Amino acid sequence: LALIFLLSSRYSDPSTNVSPLSPSAKGFKTAAVVPVYGEDENVFERVIVKLTRLFDRVIVVGDGVSEPYRSIALAHGAEFYSVPRSGKRGALEYGVSLLRDEKYVALVDSDTEVPDETYWKSLAVLESGYDALTVRIRYKGDNLTARAQDFLGYYNDVLNRAFARLGKVYVLNGQFSVYRAVKLREIIAGLSSRKLLGRLIVVGDDKELTSRAHMAGLRLAYLSSAEAVTYGASSLIVAVKQLLRWTRSGYLYLFMDLASLNYRRGFLYYIAGVVSVLYPILGASVTALGLTYPHHHQMLINLNDPFLWLVREWTKGLLAMIGVLPKEPRLFAVFVHEHFVYDSTLLLAGALKLAADLLTALATLGFVMQVLPKAREDPKGAVVSLGLLWIQGLLSIYSLITLYKVSSWLTRGQVPEKRSE
């Protein structure tokens, strides 16, 4: 049922019927804030050239770095500022503090390219009354890992559209999100000084802003029909490190949102979060049980056995309490159970099992129909993406096991990857 709901959300994109804003109708200013640290200079220059063509003002903030980014930014009409090394959060907060009279501001990663249509469509949606939005992310790269990441983004799009259907956003992604400037100023204050267990939080800046945006009651949108293009991981090791960091920050903010009673995140966020916690545990438990006790494992898979057992026990308990009608309630309960309850519960269990199988088949068919066109374009990437999903499940278990070391989650703990085209 959950999968059917997710798939039916494919038509909930608020930007589907919105035409890109005409440049002649733009009577306001826009800005882009770009934090940079260790990015490949060719990739960085390509991004800046594109942004300066679209935005009225591009603010580049070097996180403890200057050249060659300063020269590249100034050469293409962007502004450059260098701040002491403090992480992406500090660079973002400083860049936003430099805003003047801009109406909308985009937070853009230094390796993310923004197509013209995405820019103008984003402005059109914001002008319709939204306070912030994020778009679909496409991963660029010829290696199998990058192609698999792009396929994972295709899976994530299904989940993001479901959140948008409920007026929520799963995450205002850090690659490219656009905000109403006055609202961003309010929610970004103190971002770089956020602490947990006495340590500064460095990871999950996008998740932090998303939580704050929901808490502040901002109207958020996800645009499936618009995309930004970023570079995929250059190797499997880099991809695994990214997945581990994202998994940990996801759990971190799930627990923090629960602790702060941030009900505005919506029930789907917490359901998805709890499932993400329980699913790898249950999956590992059932697998271990199947290897140890094959018969019990089969019972868990087959809905008839546990369901019948529960219904029979409940029915026997219920009938045993009916002691006012017959003189011998125990014999009456046994008679009803043997001649009516057994056959009825068997029929009911069979009907529920059939209904579950049909719903599963329909949901699976719908999922395959959505994914198949993408899989035909890149069958190898599709296969490797399944492997990454399996790895992510293992990383989820590892993250939960190392929950007692949560303070070590608060830092990226790695040198930025140097990428080239």
Language-model-detected regions and their locations in the chain:
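Acidic helix N-cap motif at the loop->helix transition within catalytic regions
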Residues: 43-46, 66-74, 117
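Short, well-formed alpha-helical segments that are part of the catalytic scaffolds
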Residues: 38-53
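Cell-envelope/extracellular polymer assembly enzymes that use nucleotide-activated donors
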Residues: 29-33, 208
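Short beta-strand-to-loop acidic/aromatic patch adjacent to the donor-nucleotide binding site
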Residues: 102-113
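Glycine-rich, basic loop-to-helix element that forms the pyrophosphate-binding segment
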Residues: 83-98
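Juxtamembrane C-terminal module of membrane proteins
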Residues: 2-29, 51-60, 69, 102, ...
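Long helical/loop segments within the catalytic core of UDP-sugar-dependent glycosyltransferases
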Residues: 90-91, 116-202, 244-251, 255
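Catalytic donor-sugar/metal-binding loop of nucleotide-sugar-dependent glycosyltransferases
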Residues: 207-228
